[in-house]
């Protein structure tokens, strides 16, 4: 923190200042330290035989740290002399009043004129229940009114900005209503078709049936899609960088041990993602799947009732189990999100005591069923959902690329 030294009659006074504080505060502290029972307007701080502005923040004064300032009477300097300006009109200073909810207002006013009437005019219907902010200071309007303060008393000697802070909520609502009459026109945002798009929510309690593929697993593994699907996105890079920084500490900081990492992780608030729907996929013994969307506040009793509606035998006794860790879920009033802590997508296992190994789902639902591998191939990624796909679904087998027989660019040898 910068240090300022004030000299007066061979005495020294050292004071610490912040970057946003003004030398007007230093002047008041110096007068109190040297026990000068006069007004602060009669004194000024001198540096290199010139008065220093008292209304500018420290970071704008361009003064070195530990600068030596001299406390002197303002009568010794005609610029700050108040008694010698009786025949000279006071300076007119431009002040910009910033009012929340309205445009800024610029007014010219003498530096010796009380600012309470002008502030009352600017505040409108707020009355006396507001404050003003000058640089880093916040002053009540009642104090300005009672002490009859002027711009000189506030340390303002040059064009400055004054912010009005209202405490009354009704006045702020009135301002927002006035601003709503003349809304600001914002230019329309341009959207890129290749930007990330959010998938629409699923229809609640509507089933989607998926059947296992007839192709061997070896054939499915050899079917490699386009290499663009494996490119690292910006979100994935940020997530990976955050994981590395949490393990090794931030750049330039100390390396955190395992205990400190666990302690910092426990101190962080849990940021629960806003889940709008719980997508449950039930796997049957014949490897068929049925996918149903539920609300997060629905219970397991509703899940059991909805799943039983799509069975051939609706009165069949069955049990839904959590896949990992394996846990039977009872038909009770436990909420999906609050009690069972289900995510946006959850897999459940269907278990029954019936000896039937055939299809358990109704026939009209099986007619519209999709292959599981077909779903994973044709479903576009979120980042490329708006990209055009000129090829139809029928020639998926021909569009699949095999990169095992291709030579990468970095492995090609030069012909020289």
Curated annotation (Swiss-Prot):
Q: Which GO terms describe its molecular function?
A: protein-containing complex binding
* InterPro entries linked to this entry: TUG-UBL1, Ubiquitin-like_domsf, UBX_dom
Biological processes per GO annotation = ERAD pathway; intracellular protein transport; sporulation resulting in formation of a cellular spore
Domain spans labelled UBX: 273-350
Kindly list the GO CC terms recorded for this protein: cytoplasm; nucleus; vesicle membrane
Other observations noted: Present with 3570 molecules/cell in log phase SD medium.
Its protein name is: UBX domain-containing protein 4
Source species taxonomy = Eukaryota, Fungi, Dikarya, Ascomycota, Saccharomycotina
